[in-house]
Design a protein with these regions (language model features):
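Active-site beta-strand->loop->alpha-helix modules in alpha/beta enzyme cores, enriched
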Residues: 1-189, 274-283
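A generic secondary-structure signal marking the coil-to-beta-strand transition
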Residues: 35-36, 107, 199-200, 216, ...
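Sparse recognition of residues in long alpha-helices and their boundaries
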Residues: 110, 192, 243-244
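A short beta-turn/loop motif at secondary-structure boundaries
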Residues: 164, 193-195, 249
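Short, flexible loop segments at boundaries between secondary-structure elements
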Residues: 184-212
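A conserved mid-domain beta-alpha-beta active-site/ligand-binding segment of alpha/beta enzyme cores
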Residues: 203-260
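Short, active-site-adjacent segments that bind or coordinate small-molecule cofactors and metal centers
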Residues: 242-284
């Protein structure tokens, strides 16, 4: 097998099947040297499970990769001994994991919100003076997301699917999407200058299936799959990690993405629906 055929990208656009051996070849409005990818990980291992191949593919095309880890991992202990220091254990495992995928430590952002209760951190509110999550005097998922979206100015973003059963994943999905629009507007100027363009957003399946079928398939050499498995295995404190490794290995060197499209409300789009020409007159 040649090097070219080891990498395959297939994007479905309506009835059209677009195929290439690079991400650029199948991507929408590729921005060349300006491309920057941002991965949103509700918990430290989510992005590795859902996008460990994609991260390596981005490195192959010299695309900077940034990762936001939203929660502090404090509820991820599997033994009594881990209970007091699991957050620090998982932080070190995260650095080891992303190092295996080629992501530099300085590109990993820790938001530090309490694990398993991210719903308590929705929105934005005035921060207590001693809150380490405070940014410009405020705290909350939308506050932090808006800050980092403006700081990084990504061209494409990747996060777990909205259909995941984990409440933290659902909250992150919702809060991140509205933060994209905050980041593009003039609201909260202390968090930085607005981004010029809202980035493209893609869903990754981590535990649950996509709400609708994905439209991008990525195939890599087995060597990239082995690197992904190595990165997953770095989370040694998570005793269930072995079963996840088995699932990923059996699935082979493939990952899938589903593009999200935002359709803003336009009242004029419904005008013709209510015109007489579309209906039979009602007779009493």
């Amino acid at each position: 097998m040649t090097k070219e055929t080891e990498f395959e990208f297939v994007r479905l656009v309506g009835t059209e099947r677009r195929k290439a051996d690079t991400l650029a070849g199948v991507s929408r409005r590729w921005q060349g040297e300006n491309e920057r990818f941002l991965f949103i990980s509700p918990h430290d291992d989510d992005v590795v499970l859902g996008g460990g191949l994609l991260i390596q593919l981005a490195q192959r095309e010299n695309i900077p990769v940034h990762v936001i880890v939203v929660s502090d991992g404090s509820m991820g202990y599997c033994t009594e001994e881990q209970k007091e220091n699991i957050s620090e254990i998982r932080r070190q495992e995260t650095y080891e994991s992303f190092k295996a995928l080629g992501v530099p430590a300085e590109n990993i952002i820790w938001m530090g919100f309490p694990d398993s209760i991210l719903s308590d951190s929705c929105g934005r509110k005035a921060a207590q003076s001693d809150d380490p999550k405070s940014i410009e005097g405020f705290v909350g998922l939308q506050n932090s997301f808006t800050k980092y979206i403006r700081q990084i100015a990504p061209t494409q973003c990747f996060l777990p699917t909205s259909s995941d059963l984990h409440p933290d994943h659902k909250v992150v999905h919702q809060e991140f999407l509205i933060s994209l629009f905050h980041a593009a507007g003039n609201i909260w100027p202390e968090l930085g200058s607005p981004i010029e363009n809202v980035p493209y957003v893609h869903e990754m399946a981590v535990y649950c299936d996509f709400p609708e079928p994905p439209n991008l398939r990525m195939k890599t050499p087995e060597s990239l799959l082995e690197k992904k498995l190595e990165a997953i295995a770095a989370f040694k404190s998570q005793q269930q990690i072995g079963s996840l490794i088995d699932i990923v290995r059996k699935s082979g060197p493939y990952e899938y993405l589903r593009a999200l499209n935002f359709k803003l409300y336009q009242p004029a789009a419904y005008y013709d629906m209510f015109e007489k020409k579309h209906h039979i007159p009602f007779i009493r």
